[in-house]
Amino acid sequence: MARFVVAALLVLLCLSGLEAIQHAPKIQVYSRHPAENGKPNFLNCYVSGFHPSDIEVDLLKNGKKIEKVEHSDLSFSKDWSFYLLYYTEFTPNEKDEYACRVSHVTFPTPKTVKWDRNM
């Protein structure tokens, strides 16, 4: 019985230690296909390497939140960090600016990464 209690306490300590670890997300914004003005495409925001899992991701058009956005299920890597993909259909042109805004406990304020049509 005593061994069980000790083992249970060790497991709890390990799990609580995982919550104390914080890793800032890496944010990558890119289109599925090379950008061509007037041609439908998909805008992707891949957020990876973050911990803990609580995160808020928004895709933006000219600084305003795009409402029709889909995302993958929250997944984790071998190192227990998390990753997600947010995406939406869009039609690029010369005047509109697209970006991904991420809020996470590791950022004092939300971080915004602009889409570079040449990447």
Swiss-Prot record:
Its main location: secreted. GO terms for cellular component: extracellular region; MHC class I protein complex. It is found in: Secreted. Residues 1-20 form the signal peptide. Keywords: Disulfide bond, Immunity, Immunoglobulin domain, MHC I, Secreted, Signal. Pfam families: C1-set. Heterodimer of an alpha chain and a beta chain. Beta-2-microglobulin is the beta-chain of major histocompatibility complex class I molecules. Belongs to the beta-2-microglobulin family. Component of the class I major histocompatibility complex (MHC). Involved in the presentation of peptide antigens to the immune system. This is Beta-2-microglobulin. It comes from Sapajus apella.
